[in-house]
From Swiss-Prot:
Keyword Nucleus found: yes
GO cellular component terms given for this protein: cytoplasm; nucleus; proteasome core complex; proteasome core complex, beta-subunit complex
Name of the featured protein: Proteasome subunit beta type-1-A
Sequence similarity: Belongs to the peptidase T1B family.
Record function comment: Non-catalytic component of the proteasome, a multicatalytic proteinase complex which is characterized by its ability to cleave peptides with Arg, Phe, Tyr, Leu, and Glu adjacent to the leaving group at neutral or slightly basic pH. The proteasome has an ATP-dependent proteolytic activity.
Pfam family, one: Proteasome
Main location: cytoplasm
Protein location: Cytoplasm; Nucleus
Gene that produces this protein: psmb1-A
Subunit note: The 26S proteasome consists of a 20S proteasome core and two 19S regulatory subunits. The 20S proteasome core is composed of 28 subunits that are arranged in four stacked rings, resulting in a barrel-shaped structure. The two end rings are each formed by seven alpha subunits, and the two central rings are each formed by seven beta subunits. The catalytic chamber with the active sites is on the inside of the barrel.
Length: 238
């Protein structure tokens, strides 16, 4: 073992380092793996979209890792943050949904899934899952619904929501194009499914130009009463 000269005193012995206080040992179980998720609710449909890049720092671990997970025939969840927690959380949700279906002989509604997820996250509030969740689906009346969460369980129903590394770029665009925020003398026409899909493609293409953690491909889950349809759109890969 090589010992530097600075570590030895004048007598050739190792220096004795004394600490003036307690030594704090660092424990950092989390990592940020990037990625962006987005959900939009319409009159009779909902969209949940995400990019497929899984990265950490300047390294790309995978170019084919979507962050949209199908829960039921009318509900999809988008998760971004620490990928390990995303996988663990979605497995817990899927297990709870199977137990519910076996007990009640029916699938859980989107609103009930959102309430259940809130209790799961709050139960881990002292050691939370590092995951930002957005649920998109149809409610009991067949209308589109979006539920957004923070990591410890607070949630609310929205018409549109973006989360993840590029959310600060996507949310203002959604506010302008869907919410018509701070706009005067503008006719607020209902959002059609075709326009919503095109808007999602446009905002992700713009985000991939500016956010290094977003890119490779875009996966869009289109939820209607007929079921869930998926579209894949290529994004820039650098």
């Amino acid at each position: 073992m090589m010992i530097s000269a600075q570590a030895c005193g004048a007598n050739g012995r190792m220096k004795d380092y004394h600490y003036t206080g307690p030594v704090e040992h660092k424990f950092s179980p989390y990592a940020f793996n990037g990625g962006t998720v987005l959900a939009v609710a319409g009159e009779d449909f909902a969209l949940v979209a995400s990019d497929t890049r899984l990265s950490e720092g300047y390294s790309i671990h995978s170019r084919d890792s979507p962050k949209c997970y199908k829960l039921t025939d009318t509900t999809v969840i988008g998760c971004s943050g620490f990928h390990g927690d995303c996988l663990t959380l979605t497995k817990i949700i899927e297990a709870r949904l199977k137990m519910y279906k076996h007990s009640n002989n029916k699938s859980m509604t989107s609103g009930a899934i959102a309430a259940m997820l809130s209790t799961i996250l709050y139960g881990r509030r002292f050691f939370p899952y590092y995951v930002y969740n957005i649920i998109g689906g149809l409610d009991e009346e067949g209308r589109g619904a979006v539920y957004s969460f923070d990591p410890v369980g607070s949630y609310q129903r929205d018409t549109y929501k973006a989360g993840g590394s590029a959310s600060a770029m996507l949310q203002p665009l959604l506010d302008n194009q869907i919410g018509f925020k701070n706009m005067e003398n503008v006719e607020q026409v209902p959002l059609s499914q075709e326009k919503a899909v095109q808007l999602v493609k446009d905002v992700f293409i713009s985000a991939a130009e500016r956010d290094v953690y977003t890119g490779d491909a875009l996966k869009i889950c289109i939820i209607t009463k007929e079921g869930i349809r998926e579209e894949i759109v290529p994004l820039r890969k650098d």
